[in-house]
Amino acid sequence: YTLQLYMEFSGCMDIVIGAGRLLGVRLPENFCRPFASRNAAEFWRRWHITLGAWLKTYVFYPVSVSRMVKKWNRFGKKHLGKYLTRLGATAMCLFPVWLCNGLWHGPSWHYIFYGMYYFVILLAGAALEPVRAGVIRFFHINERALYWKIPCILKTWVIIFTGELFFRANGLKAGMTMFFSIFRDFRLSVLWDGTLLDFSLDKGDYLVIFAGLLLTAGIGIIKERNLLKGKGLQDMRTPFRWALYYGLILSVLIFGAYGIGYQQVDLIYAGF
């Protein structure tokens, strides 16, 4: 579900940004390879960037300079110390941001829980940051090395996929049922016993999905590591560039879903 949401939303925004550029309008980027993030805070700096920027400007910053936070900082410096003071101020600023994030998607308890889930995750990250920094210093860990980056990315995936489970659920109770069923009904055998074919998808559909994921991941890695040195399609030689254009059009014709019997399905995010 999370990957489908990303493909739809990010792809739609790419179309909008591209159409805007054809008309001479440059729109802000809304996604920046979020699944390469090493923690939840970084993920939300890369995912739905415009919503995050709005919440930061109109919720986080006003709260951070509010009288309540200033009073807390003065009290904390006298009685609590730097660490607890900063953590308390962080909690005061993050809580309304993530409450608004949840309510922005809808006035429902599972959306509120979704926002509070990230509030707890990000606050825990801020609380444990000194521990993380101490571990890195003690063991002389190179944060750019793959042995560190890959586990961090995988850990972030678990956090994000768990959050999106509650986002996808039809209600908070349904979300809890879905979450606990992961542990109660966990079976790796569903990957090869034919269960996956019960979701109205055949082997050809899964092949297309797998190929799309590989292509998306490959392009993401190339852009994340800047392997093209900032060059894009416009920097390619004309024959290669047009061959790629026609190849992309052909891929839509081959893999696209259309024709007799096709029923158009609304984008997931169209509901928001």
Where are these regions (language model features)?
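Membrane-embedded transmembrane alpha-helical bundles that form the catalytic cores
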Residues: Y1-G271
